[in-house]
């Protein structure tokens, strides 16, 4: 892939992020100008958010030609689909659908979709967004060595790394977690695994959210110690870990009852502590 062409003038979050992701993936420069007809036809040039065409084989990723009743779509949606991470982006990035709505429908319709006052959408805006988009819009050419181009590549790389590593971790978790029945509660347990990365434990909440099960809590290796952490899932009040705060092998129990840390590692002992934590 040779380079990216996107429109000149004001920039929006979707074209900024779409270009960031492509710059990270292919280490190529960005040109902010109208594309030529030759570039639109060239399968080695990414044409993003301009050009009136969505044709992944020719690397065309514009959405402005879609009909008014087309599902909200932005240039980032199209680039994510091209890279095979769109479904996970929608699933695991809560801001993704909002970004699509804002770009395709505007703030007022987005507010109606979110069931909030339009002013709330403005309240969620960030001065970081404003400055980055302005700096991006001021440039005509950005290589990955340009200060803004380098930052964009870092942002795009972070996005792709998050989505791809999360998918790997979720696939791995499906092969190693256990589901315990503690009285009438179901608990998701992640055992210690040799060489396990901290990211695997961090993905446990996402994994549980994907399950069609009534999970009350999780048990996973403590990132800061040798024992385990026990946590309510979705703040499930059927568990209250203050009920085990005086146990000798429990060195921390939050006063709000949603988490506890224990030096215990034997599964039977962990199950016993969970049973003691159940609110009857």
Feature annotation, model-predicted:
Residues 9, 13-20, 41-44, 68-73, ...:
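C-terminal accessory domains and tails appended to enzymatic cores
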Residues 5-45, 52:
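N-terminal ordered "arm"
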Residues 33-35, 63, 220:
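Conserved beta-strand termini and adjacent loop/short-helix elements that scaffold enzyme active sites
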Residues 1-3, 42-46, 55-58, 184-185:
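Short coil/turn segments at beta-strand junctions that form active-site/ligand-binding loops
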């Amino acid at each position: 892939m040779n380079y990216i062409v996107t429109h000149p003038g004001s920039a929006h979050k979707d074209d900024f992020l779409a270009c960031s992701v492509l710059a990270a993936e292919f280490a190529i420069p960005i040109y902010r100008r109208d594309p030529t007809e030759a570039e639109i036809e060239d399968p080695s040039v990414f044409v993003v958010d301009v050009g009136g065409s969505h044709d992944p084989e020719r690397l065309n990723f514009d959405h402005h030609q879609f009909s008014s009743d087309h599902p909200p779509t932005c240039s980032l949606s199209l680039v994510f689909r091209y890279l095979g991470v769109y479904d996970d982006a929608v699933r695991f990035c809560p801001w993704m659908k909002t970004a699509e709505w804002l770009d395709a429908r505007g703030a007022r319709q987005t507010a109606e979709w979110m069931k909030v006052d339009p002013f709330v959408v403005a309240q969620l805006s960030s001065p970081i967004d404003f400055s980055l988009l302005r700096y991006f819009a001021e440039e005509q050419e950005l290589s990955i060595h340009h200060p803004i181009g380098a930052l964009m590549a870092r942002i795009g790389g972070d996005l792709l790394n998050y989505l791809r590593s999360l998918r790997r971790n979720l696939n791995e978790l499906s092969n190693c977690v256990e589901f315990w029945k503690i009285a009438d509660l179901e608990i998701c347990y992640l055992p210690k695994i040799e060489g396990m990365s901290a990211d695997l434990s961090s993905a446990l909440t996402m994994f549980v959210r994907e399950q069609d099960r009534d999970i009350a809590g999780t048990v996973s290796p403590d990132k800061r110690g040798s024992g385990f952490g026990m946590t309510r899932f979705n703040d499930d009040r059927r568990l209250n870990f203050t009920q085990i705060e005086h146990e000798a092998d429990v060195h921390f129990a939050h006063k709000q009852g949603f988490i506890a840390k224990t030096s215990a590692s034997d599964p039977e002992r962990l199950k016993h502590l969970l049973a003691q934590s159940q609110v009857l």
